[in-house]
A protein has these predicted regions:
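Solvent-exposed alpha-helices and their adjacent loops that cap or buttress functional pockets
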Residues: 2-7, 24-28, 45-46, 67-69, ...
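Active-site glycine-rich loop that binds ribose-phosphate moieties when present
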Residues: 19-20, 86-89, 151-152, 193-195
Length: 222
């Protein structure tokens, strides 16, 4: 009998604030955890043990650095002047984990009144990188909002309560062949662009499936 393929969940923890309960619950006990800079502080506070620390390390605490050295985490340090964000570097590192099946990004939202919308948008856009299609599932929980990325060749099953809201957004460019089954408002071979809101506020059914033929579709679950 052939050996069953391992399905590794790789979790990327970013900084910004404490992780929500929804984010923490999405992380499996056997997950491989990668921290992006000060994401290590949030990961440790949530009871995780990061195996890798990635970034320019300009925002991680001194205690976080000491934790990484004491626990012999792999440290991939980059110069502050770089073209990629720490989040992008961490996502790229996630794809190098053997048998990666799901990439899950988790992050909190700092309640300081100085939230960086540009950072949040850049993080969501990074999740749609074509290379991430190598993982079968790409998801995120940012604050208390869940995201799922739908790449061509993969479909996403939304495990939601009936009538729970979800939205479809073409944030990464036009999407064609958008098909949604089991929802209140199904779609068949539809096209969505980033300038229309036709996919906002749909309602899940008993089993809701989402797929796309071309483009990268973002499913938002408030």
């Amino acid at each position: 009998m052939a050996e069953q393929q391992r399905r590794v969940q790789v979790v990327v923890v970013i900084g910004g604030g404490p992780l929500s309960g929804r984010a923490a619950r999405a992380v499996r006990d056997d997950a491989f955890v990668i921290a992006a800079d000060s994401g290590l502080d949030q990961a440790v506070a949530a009871g995780m043990r990061p195996s890798v620390l990635v970034g320019d390390l300009d925002s991680i605490s001194a205690a976080g650095r000491m934790w990484a050295y004491a626990h012999e985490a792999e440290i991939d340090e980059y110069p502050a002047d770089k073209d990629l964000t720490d989040t992008e570097l961490a996502l790229a590192r996630a794809l190098r984990v053997p048998d990666v099946w799901q990439v899950l990004l988790v992050g909190g939202i700092e309640d300081t009144g100085e939230r960086r919308l540009d950072h949040q948008l850049a993080t969501i856009l990074a999740l749609g990188h074509p290379a991430l299609a190598a993982a079968h599932h790409v998801r995120a929980v940012i604050g208390t909002t869940e995201l799922a990325m739908v790449h061509p060749g993969h479909h996403v099953v939304l495990e939601l309560e009936e009538r729970q809201l979800f939205s479809l957004l073409a944030l990464h460019g036009p999407c064609t062949g958008v098909t949604v089954t089991g929802a209140r408002w199904p779609l068949t071979d539809a096209s969505l662009t980033g300038t229309e809101a036709r996919g906002v506020s749909n309602e899940a059914g008993e089993r809701t499936d989402v797929s796309v033929a071309t483009g990268v579709l973002t499913v938002v679950i408030p």
